[in-house]
Every structure is written in structure tokens, then in C-alpha cells.
């Protein structure tokens, strides 16, 4: 089993698809990495040899931030937004949608579960 950037890639999949299991790598970046490393996209992960794995690791380090480095950078960017007090930072702090989505209805993913509000009892005379 090929282990790249701390992730075990699925053995039966093609390498171009297997690389997308790493956080921060999509289809286009996967193809770019394989092109730079000089590896055919149609080869399966189980058929990779050690030199090909090493070439992928080396190219990956040169090309992009992935996994832990990328996650920590994203968290630092969000923390910076919250610290400077900009609109996006306030939305992150309050746990609301950041990119202009509506919040009167929907936005349940960001806001959490539904909070029911009890009705006031009518006063009888």
C-alpha cells in the first residue's frame, strides 16, 4: 500500500484518483504532479514501485501544501480574520455563513440544529 503525505492510498484505484484522497489535492493538481514526476496516469496504485513513489513524494513537496500544513494554514487564516475584526471574521466567530448566504431560513449546517421557540400563552380574562 502506497503511503504518501501520511495517507494510505487505495490500492485498486488509478494513481490519478488515488492522489485525490490527500487533503488539498484535486483532479487537476493530481494530473500536474504525475506529469512533473513523469508517471503515467493510468497506472494503478498497487503497481507503483519505490522509485515512482519517491518521485511523487518529491514532486508533491515542491508543488503544493497538503494535509497538516494546509489545514493549519487555513486555521491561521481564519484566526487572523477573527483577530482583525473584519466582517468575515465576525461571521466565523458567530458561527454564521461567511460568503453572503441567507440566514432567515436554511444555514442549518453552519448554525447547528434547529432551536424551537415556545409560543407565549394567551392571557384569558
UniProtKB/Swiss-Prot annotation:
One of the GO biological process terms: translation
GO MF, any single term: rRNA binding
UniProt key word DNA damage: no
UniProt keyword annotations, A-Z: Ribonucleoprotein, Ribosomal protein, RNA-binding, rRNA-binding, tRNA-binding
Function (record text): Located at the top of the head of the 30S subunit, it contacts several helices of the 16S rRNA. In the 70S ribosome it contacts the 23S rRNA (bridge B1a) and protein L5 of the 50S subunit (bridge B1b), connecting the 2 subunits; these bridges are implicated in subunit movement. Contacts the tRNAs in the A and P-sites.
Binding partners and assembly: Part of the 30S ribosomal subunit. Forms a loose heterodimer with protein S19. Forms two bridges to the 50S subunit in the 70S ribosome.
PANTHER family: 30S RIBOSOMAL PROTEIN S13/40S RIBOSOMAL PROTEIN S18, SMALL RIBOSOMAL SUBUNIT PROTEIN US13M
Protein name, per record: Small ribosomal subunit protein uS13
Amino acid at each position: 500500500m502506497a503511503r504518501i503525505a501520511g495517507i494510505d492510498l487505495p490500492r485498486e484505484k488509478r494513481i490519478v484518483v488515488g492522489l485525490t484522497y490527500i487533503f488539498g489535492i484535486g483532479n487537476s493538481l493530481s494530473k500536474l504532479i504525475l506529469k512533473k514526476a513523469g508517471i503515467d496516469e493510468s497506472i494503478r496504485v498497487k503497481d507503483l514501485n519505490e522509485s515512482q513513489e519517491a518521485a511523487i513524494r518529491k514532486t508533491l513537496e515542491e508543488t503544493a501544501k497538503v494535509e497538516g500544513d494546509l489545514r493549519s494554514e487555513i486555521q491561521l487564516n481564519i484566526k487572523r480574520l477573527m483577530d482583525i475584526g473584519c466582517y468575515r471574521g465576525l461571521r466565523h466567530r458567530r458561527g454564521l455563513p461567511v460568503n453572503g448566504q441567507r440566514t432567515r431560513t436554511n444555514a442549518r449546517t453552519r448554525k447547528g440544529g434547529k432551536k424551537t421557540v415556545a409560543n407565549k400563552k394567551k392571557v384569558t380574562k
